[in-house]
Amino acid sequence: SRGLGDVYKRQDLTRRKTMYPIVRKEKLADNIILMDIKAPRVAKECLPGQFIIAKTDEVGERIPLTICDYDREKETVTIVVQTIGAGTERMMALNEGDSLEDFVGPLGCPSELCQEDNLEETKKKHIVFIAGGLGTAPVYPQVKWLKEHGVDADVIMGFRNKDILFFEDEMKAVAKNLYVCTDDGSYGFHGNGSQQLQALVDAGNTYDCCVAIGPMIMMKFTCLLTKKLEIPTIVSMNPIMVDGTGMCGACRLIVDGKVKFACVDGPEFDGHLVDFDQAMKRQQQYKTEEGRAKLAYEEGATHHGGCGNCGGDK
């Protein structure tokens, strides 16, 4: 009888027949690039809030990336990549005309705000998005979708400094009001996204819903503020992912005291119910082999790579 490994090998052989060409590459800032990938099936089915997992070559690591935009007519999907390791360095080195080995998706659940079944309720809300750094990429398609469906939203974009600011013009075109802030005060409001939100509330602005996307520490402190302000808050969790189907257990979270997996249950969750401290601690542990072994011991049946099938050992 054939095992699971044989199934994965057959799937890999099938996928190798289809490559995913890079039709556009653009530098957004130092170590941050945008790519348009020809991926007809993903482009046809994806919605804001979902993500893909890409591989540059047969031996490359699986890299989860949020869908930043899509064009169903051109059959392209836009991703934004920041170099943080060998896998993203390899991807950054590719040029227009080159191809990715794998481009699997769409994965995860679409944003609850960007679903037509919820549209009438969404139209009643005054929404503010807070994008922290690379979190700008997943915020953009949501705000764009809302504008196309008659829903206005304010957007706060936060960056460490003006040199890594990107998508200002694109966001300005779809947001009702755009507020840009930098930690060092080199551009826009001097402060972070939470401080900008507090300033807006102090000035008399009211919001029924906040969507915060960015580094975990940024989302944690945004949620502490919005809980105090009694603003329901959605976060998009970005823990380590390997297979994107819930098998590997890398993206395990605790939400409202229950185990959830960001890749299949999310990536969006009620920010006021997420255990951010546990998620950040776990993310640090997962970066080392010793840490993965400790998590495997503590979590038992949850898989933590090394099987040779899911790619967690690559």
Walk through the language-model features, giving the residues of each.
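Local cysteine-cluster metal-coordination motifs and their immediate loop/turn environment
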Residues: 138, 216, 238-268, 302-313
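A generic structural signal for residues embedded in beta-strands
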Residues: 54, 102-103, 253
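Short, surface-exposed secondary-structure boundary micro-motifs
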Residues: 57, 105-106, 256
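Short, small-residue-biased leader/transition segments that mark boundaries at the very start
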Residues: 1-8
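FNR/FR-type flavoprotein reductase catalytic core
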Residues: 89-242
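Short Fe-S-cluster ligation motifs
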Residues: 261-265, 269-314
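Short, Lys/Arg- and Gly-enriched loop/turn segments at beta-strand edges
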Residues: 60-67, 107-117, 263
